[in-house]
Amino acid sequence: MKEQVLESPFCKKEFLELVDIVSEAKTTKLANYAISDSSIVNIGDRDFVDYRPDISIDPQVLKDNNISSISFDSLHFFQVQNLVEEIDTKSVKIKKSDVAVNLILPKTYEEYLESLTKKNRHELRRKKRKFDNETTSYELGESKEQDIFDIFISQHRESKGEKGEFMTEVVETYFRNLLNLQGWKIYYTNTDKGVLSTAFCYENDDGCYLYNSSRNNEFNSINPGIVLNDLIIQQLIERDMAFFDFLKGTER
């Protein structure tokens, strides 16, 4: 898991530079962290960053900047351990706030189905049948093109509540710039009824990180998001990928 965290897009310099446009301004930025007033904090707001790079803090930095507190989020436990061992502190408070769901991929899709509980396997098959019955044809697509990106954005904005409010013009620009970076792509369900769901992902040689998603809410009853994830899993297994990381969030 350590390698999966540190090889994620969230630890790369180009991502940390880009995520600044949707994050609160920090006073001073150093190597993989920032200083805000008298506190050391992460670079990039937690709503946009699922994993963090390794962080090493020189004790002299604490002294020179009169640091009174260190406040980090989205750290894996191995990173928490390293920081506790490295820094001399009066007290440490660890709070579990998010869960990242990670699927280790088997060698075959049949093995994946067998790994599900009987109930979940039945539910997946039922939902796929319903999708089959409501669509004449469908396939998994992947793209970095503007037309698919526009669908991803519009489906977000047509959503109710926080999901719809999330996609501001600034956030749209952020996602567009992300898509231009190497490794980022949009998976989508290409059907006779149009694009019913999308998944904004990052891929490397080992696996896939599901960063964000959208769907056409008119078709919620046939579960286009679940079908898309299932299609992605099938393709990743066929390509001998090691994992499908759903990252953190309430929709997993």
Regions found by a protein language model. Give the residues of each.
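A conserved beta-strand-loop-helix scaffold within acyl/acetyltransferase catalytic domains
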Residues: 1-41, 75-221
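Conserved acetyl-CoA-binding loop-helix of GNAT-fold acetyltransferases
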Residues: 55-61, 220-234
